[in-house]
Amino acid sequence: LCTAPIHKKALQDGAGFAYPGHTEYLQALAGADRAVMMLASEQLRVVPTTIHIALRDVPKMLTPALLRDTIRITAEGLRQQFGIAQPRIAVAGLNPAEGYALRGPLPADTMFHATARASYDAAVCMYHDQALIPIKTLDFDRGVNVTLGLPFIRTSPDHGTAFDIAGTGVANPSSMIEALRMAHRMANP
């Protein structure tokens, strides 16, 4: 299933749609416990543990159970949807310089360098911007949103409706095209 961008507020306010977006709706339809957003490109795959909350709220939202669940769903998605038998997952720290001697969490300011990216298959990040800034910097026009945790493949372009450029002839279809291609590759390993 490859979905196109939707205007969430218009659906909720104008049509009475009871869900924040596609992901939550598909999760409910599928009876899935939790769906996780992965942004993927040829260069990088990232998964934010928390999404669409204020940065000041991230520390209180992060729990060992939430992080464990995010990592589990990411690993399952890498195996089932990307064909990676033994997924290597990097975990970004919220405050990695706190002084603990750990291999991970990794400092987000260096974990996205090309050499570091070669050592893992996906990065689990603590919050939305920590995950999205590197992928949009590396591959802005070809990023794909992959929903993990559903019993079927779901992709979508990594952008919104872009009403501000509708009808101007400047919209770039690359992310939608890549979302269709990635769904096809995932369905035909």
Regions found by a protein language model. Name each.
Residues L1-P189:
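Anion-binding alpha/beta catalytic cores of soluble intermediary-metabolism enzymes, centered on
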